[in-house]
């Protein structure tokens, strides 16, 4: 079968036999795919230096007749993050890997945009903003200016319950102040905001509860 070429992000590598890897990618035109990288674990394999996460990749593969395709070539482009952000970047890829399953036609552009958010925001806020963005494009978040249950305009203090922002009439739970809501909106719009430690912890917990509500395993930064 003819080879296919596409831009991609590497999500994960799984050892297969003593010499090969199963690689999961988010590709621009083909969504999430899994490919066999034959011989990639051998010391002299050309794949060893190029199969790295957090780089812009261009991959070529041959589709399988009945199952997994075979990776043919990988061209590694520029790094997508500064080294100091690598751990947060890997967490973001782990969450993207759980959001976008094999066969999903989406994921590449969404994850690429989330990585840009991570790169451009202050370190305290970057991962929060990037994951919040992914949850938003997944359709799991609403407008912070209204109750997500009844649609009423947000009050001074709202509550986070069952991964939703609720007014006092619709529920109770973890308080979410108007200041935090405004700060989240500002950060997501590109503003520079100094978060109090309490507000950052609350935003992180909001994210953790959304992941939990949708049975997505939390990464280390979001474990309660």
Regions found by a protein language model. Name each.
Residues 1-21, 26-224:
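Non-catalytic alpha-helical scaffolds and adjoining flexible linkers that form interface surfaces
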């Amino acid at each position: 079968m003819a080879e296919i070429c596409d831009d991609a992000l590497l999500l994960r590598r799984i050892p297969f036999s003593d010499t090969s890897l199963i690689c999961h990618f988010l590709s621009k035109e083909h969504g999430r795919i899994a490919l066999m990288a034959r011989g990639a674990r051998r010391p002299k394999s050309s794949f060893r230096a190029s199969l790295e996460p957090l780089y812009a990749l261009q991959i070529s593969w041959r589709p399988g007749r009945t199952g997994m395709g075979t990776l043919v070539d990988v061209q590694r482009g520029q790094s997508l993050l500064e080294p100091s952000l690598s751990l947060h970047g890997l967490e973001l890829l782990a969450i993207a890997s759980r959001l976008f399953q094999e066969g999903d036609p989406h994921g590449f552009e969404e994850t690429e945009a989330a990585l840009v958010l991570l790169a451009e925001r202050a370190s305290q806020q970057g991962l929060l903003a990037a994951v919040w963005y992914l949850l938003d494009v997944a359709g799991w978040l609403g407008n912070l200016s209204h109750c997500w249950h009844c649609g009423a305009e947000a009050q001074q203090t709202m509550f986070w319950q069952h991964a939703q922002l609720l007014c006092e009439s619709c529920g109770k739970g973890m308080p979410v102040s108007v200041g935090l809501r405004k700060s989240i909106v500002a950060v997501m719009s590109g503003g520079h905001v100094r978060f109090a430690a309490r507000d950052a912890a609350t935003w992180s917990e909001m994210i953790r509860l959304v992941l939990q509500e949708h049975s997505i395993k939390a990464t280390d930064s979001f474990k309660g």
